[in-house]
Amino acid sequence: MLLLLVPVLEVIFTLGGTRAQSVTQLGSHVSVSEGALVLLRCNYSSSVPPYLFWYVQYPNQGLQLLLKYTSAATLVKGINGFEAEFKKSETSFHLTKPSAHMSDAAEYFCAVS
């Protein structure tokens, strides 16, 4: 069983009081069996078209960009087999990986800009 830490974050960005954006990650700890599907949930709120990001922080390392959505295809493929699907109607950008590996044990962060 590997443990994926998903810090519960609510990040709010405001520019000049006219654009408010936030992300919410559900669940603070996610345990996944090796070989099982990984699903990390991220919902966002934005008054403008969002740019969405997933970052990972492995033990004793800095943040690393996994993938980003900037307005192209709704399914975004990232590094190490991770992908996320932008769903505007559900205001979601959930991170998935078909098969978890022990090396995936880390902290994952969703962000909006």
Curated annotation (Swiss-Prot):
InterPro entries (alphabetical): Ig-like_dom (IPR007110), Ig-like_dom_sf (IPR036179), Ig-like_fold (IPR013783), Ig_V-set (IPR013106), TCR_variable_region (IPR051287)
Sugar-modified residues: N43
Function: V region of the variable domain of T cell receptor (TR) alpha chain that participates in the antigen recognition. Alpha-beta T cell receptors are antigen specific receptors which are essential to the immune response and are present on the cell surface of T lymphocytes. Recognize peptide-major histocompatibility (MH) (pMH) complexes that are displayed by antigen presenting cells (APC), a prerequisite for efficient T cell adaptive immunity against pathogens.
S-S pairs: C42-C110
Gene Ontology molecular functions: MHC protein binding; peptide antigen binding
Keyword Disulfide bond: yes
Predominant place of localization: membrane
Subunit structure and binding partners: Alpha-beta TR is a heterodimer composed of an alpha and beta chain; disulfide-linked. The alpha-beta TR is associated with the transmembrane signaling CD3 coreceptor proteins to form the TR-CD3 (TcR or TCR). The assembly of alpha-beta TR heterodimers with CD3 occurs in the endoplasmic reticulum where a single alpha-beta TR heterodimer associates with one CD3D-CD3E heterodimer, one CD3G-CD3E heterodimer and one CD247 homodimer forming a stable octameric structure. CD3D-CD3E and CD3G-CD3E heterodimers preferentially associate with TR alpha and TR beta chains, respectively.
Gene designation: TRAV8-4
Keywords: Adaptive immunity, Cell membrane, Disulfide bond, Glycoprotein, Immunity, Immunoglobulin domain, Membrane, Receptor, Signal, T cell receptor
Name this protein carries in UniProt: T cell receptor alpha variable 8-4
Record SUPFAM superfamilies: Immunoglobulin
Cellular component, GO annotation: plasma membrane; T cell receptor complex
Compartments where found: Cell membrane
Keyword Disulfide bond carried by entry: yes
GO biological process: adaptive immune response; immune response
Every Ig-like domain range: 21-113
Signal peptide: 1-20
Gene3D superfamilies, A to Z: Immunoglobulins
